[in-house]
Structure formats: C-alpha cells, structure tokens
Amino acid sequence: MFAERLLAVLSGRRPVHWMLGHTIGEAYEQLVQLAPRTPLRTRGALPVVRNCGGFHPRPGVVEAFASIAAGEQVRAMAFRLEQGADLRWRCAAVELGGDPVGATRARA
C-alpha cells in the first residue's frame, strides 16, 4: 500500500531517496522538506496505517487519505497518486494533518 511507503519515510524508518522512483513533480521536494523532521515518528508504539481511502476525480488520478495511529495518537495524511504513461502509479503531492490528536488532546 502506498500509504505505508510514505509512512516509512515520514517516520524515519526509510530514507527519503527510497521514494525517488515513486514520486513526480513537487512530491519529492515535499518529502525532502518533511522527512528530516520525521513528523510521523513516535515514542513507544510504532505508527501504522489504520485506514486508507480515496476518490477518483478522473481516470489515472487518486486523491487518497490515510489515518496513521501510534498508540492513542492519530494523524491524518493525504496524498495524490497519478498514473503515468507506463501505467505505474506515482505520488504527486503529500500533505499531513495538523497536531497529533488522541492522548495529548484529551489532557487539554
């Protein structure tokens, strides 16, 4: 699942260059900016893709989302996949939700 590939990079388990052949356009630069901060790395439980879904606005394009869970914390991740002339799907954009919600939010 593509969301798991993104999670591996954004949690620091894989280097950003692992996505070179799986991105197009600005998506790789977005990952280069995000990855060093490891925004999906957590202490304790490893983050996992809890659910994933998508919408097909037109053939060859998927606007996808995933919820990433680590213990009681949940983060949102959105990404756009585009199918190339070679029929391979590549990531064209990545976006992360705001602050983690869950246990830390419950204390507020």
Residue ranges and their predicted role:
Residues 1-41:
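Core segments of small alpha/beta cavity-forming domains
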Residues 31-34, 52, 99:
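Surface-exposed loop/turn and secondary-structure junction residues enriched for glycine/proline
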Residues 40-75:
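Surface-exposed, charged secondary-structure patches
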Residues 76-108:
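Short beta-strand edge/turn micro-motifs at domain boundaries
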